[in-house]
Amino acid sequence: SRTITGREKVAICGYHGWHDWYLAANIKSNKNLNSHLLKGLESYGVPKKLKNSIYTFRMNNFKDFKKIEKIKDLSTIVMEVQREKEPDVIFLKHVRKFCNKNKIILIFDECTSGFRETYGGIHMKYKIYPDMLVLGKALGNGYPITSVLGKKKYLKKASKSFISSTFWTENSGFSAALKTLEIIDKKKIFNS
C-alpha cells in the first residue's frame, strides 16, 4: 500500500503478526499494542526510525479513531475486522468513508475471520469492502496459505514491490485452498 500512495504512515487495529512494521507501534510505549491481542510486546531490534510510522486504534472506538484522523500523510489503515466481537457497522462505514475522502488504502486482515461466517471475508456480511484483503487459515482448511486480494489498479502497482517467501514454490496450500473453496461452494456451507 505504501508503494501505491507514496506515503509511509500506517494506522492499525488488531493483531497483524510479528513484523517490524507492526512492533514499531511499541517503540514509543510497549503498551500501544496491549489491546491488540498480545500484551507487553517489546520492540527490541526494531529500527528506531520506524517510531512514528505506525499508529494504533481500537476497533469500534471512535475516540481512538479521532486521533488517527489527525495524522498527516497517512498511507494505509489495516484492520482486523473481527476477532472476539462483531464490528460496529457504523464504525466500519466511518473508516471506509474517511479512507475514500483522504485517498488512504484500507486493508482488512481477515486471516482469522475469513471463511468463518461467510464465503469469503466477514466484510461480505457487512457489505463494507476494503481496497485490499488478506485471507488465510480457513482458506486452506489447515494447510498453510495466505492470499492477498485487492482492486486491480492497486495489485498492479503493488506488484512493482518485492514480496517473497521461503515457501513460495510450495503448492500444497494452493491445492488445499482450491479444494476447500470447491467443497464450500458445492455443499453450500454458508447457505444453511
Identify the function of each model-found stretch.
Residues 1-192:
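Conserved N-terminal phosphate-binding loop of PLP-dependent enzymes in the Aspartate aminotransferase
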